[in-house]
A protein has these predicted regions:
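N-terminal membrane-targeting/pre-transmembrane regions
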Residues: 1-84
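Internal/C-terminal transmembrane anchor helices
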Residues: 84-112
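A generic structural signal for ordered secondary structure
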Residues: 116, 128, 187-189
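Non-transmembrane, membrane-adjacent beta-strand/coil modules in membrane-associated proteins
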Residues: 121-172
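A membrane-cytosol interface segment of integral membrane proteins
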Residues: 157-197
Length: 197
């Protein structure tokens, strides 16, 4: 009887060490895993035909990071012995469920441009919002003041229905700028620059 108990206890200890290792990898990796995983995963899942660029908004990276931290903490709570009553077990299960849900939602949160227009898949939303180039009323490039001078920070599109959407000016957006600027000029729209006061 005692040898069976020892084997079971050893298996549980091995399982806990395995979970502990996973949770530490998730916790430490939560700051760089989104940078490495999120965009390639989105490109594999949502590879739209003929896009000029596809990227996750910055909020998708933050949410994905938060989901990994929450999953790591939930796993640590699970093996720490805090899950002795039903409430604690339910809290841990909810933490794991919410972290997985946030991960899925952050992978589904992206925006891209192509020859037809601008496509946005919001964090809380079902399906893409489509804004054709004919729907664009105004385009503004917003500069901010930094130590070294002015830097273009956001590219904001104002649509005819009054809605606005801002892209952070990343290297990807900067490379696509000449292409979508031609589309805007075809519609008689000039990108204006706004400076801080």
């Amino acid at each position: 009887m005692s040898s069976s108990y020892t084997i079971t206890k050893k298996k549980k200890r091995d399982k806990n060490q395995y979970i502990l290792g996973i949770s530490f990898v998730l916790l430490l990796g939560s700051f760089f895993i989104p940078l490495v995983v999120l965009l390639p995963l989105q490109q594999a899942l949502y590879h739209p035909f003929g896009y000029w660029f596809l990227e996750p908004p910055r909020s998708a990276y933050f949410i994905f990071t938060g989901s990994l931290v929450l999953l790591s903490l939930s796993l640590l709570m699970m093996i720490s012995g805090l899950a002795k009553n039903k409430f604690a077990k339910g809290l841990i299960a909810a933490g794991i469920f919410i972290s997985i849900l946030l991960s899925v939602l952050s992978v589904d949160h992206y925006h891209y441009m192509n020859g037809n227009g601008i496509y946005i898949n919001p964090f809380f939303g079902f399906g893409e919002k489509e804004f054709l180039w004919a729907d664009v009323k105004e385009a503004k490039q917003i500069a901010v003041e930094e130590k070294n001078g002015l830097k273009d920070k956001n590219l904001t599109f104002v649509f005819k229905d009054g809605e606005q959407y801002s892209f952070l000016i990343t290297e990807t957006v900067r490379k696509a700028y000449p292409i979508f600027n031609v589309k805007l000029q075809e519609k008689g729209i000039q990108v204006t620059r706004e400076f801080p006061e």
